[in-house]
């Protein structure tokens, strides 16, 4: 049985992952649009690293803003990973008086784009879940 593990599971926004044995499938819903991106384990491992890096960057932005009132004005592009049927981009949105720095995760397929904004702790959790899925399903030759 294949099960989707969601780190964000709200009626209007979802971000999760599942495994079909040889590939990782990232799933996203934003408002009324749903999509998924398939990745081999190597690409998923790179995505995991980018997600961890984005969480660290976001937490540093939050600390600097709260402690020293240092404000970042631009989105920090962390990177893009190419999957089997599309690509996943990861960026960090800056903090301001109304919100903490958060991670922007985007799916890009052909001319379709979908994205969700996720808190750093949720991205860190998704990174750990991806690691667990890869380690449980990886068959080394």
UniProtKB/Swiss-Prot annotation:
Name assigned to this protein:
Uncharacterized protein MJ0496
Q: Which organism is it from?
A: Methanocaldococcus jannaschii (strain ATCC 43067 / DSM 2661 / JAL-1 / JCM 10045 / NBRC 100440)
């Amino acid at each position: 049985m294949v099960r989707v593990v969601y780190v964000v599971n709200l009626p209007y926004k979802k971000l999760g992952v599942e495994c079909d044995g040889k590939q990782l499938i990232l799933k996203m819903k934003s408002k009324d649009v749903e999509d998924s991106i398939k990745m081999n384990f190597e690409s998923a491992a790179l995505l995991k690293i980018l997600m961890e890096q984005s969480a660290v960057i976001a937490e540093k932005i939050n600390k600097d803003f709260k402690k020293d009132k240092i404000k970042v004005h631009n989105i920090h592009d962390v990177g893009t990973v190419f999957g089997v049927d599309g690509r996943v981009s990861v960026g960090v949105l800056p903090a301001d008086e109304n919100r903490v720095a958060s991670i922007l995760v985007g799916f890009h397929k052909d001319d379709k784009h979908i994205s969700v904004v996720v808190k750093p702790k949720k991205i860190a959790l998704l990174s750990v879940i991806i690691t667990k899925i890869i380690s449980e399903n990886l068959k080394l030759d």
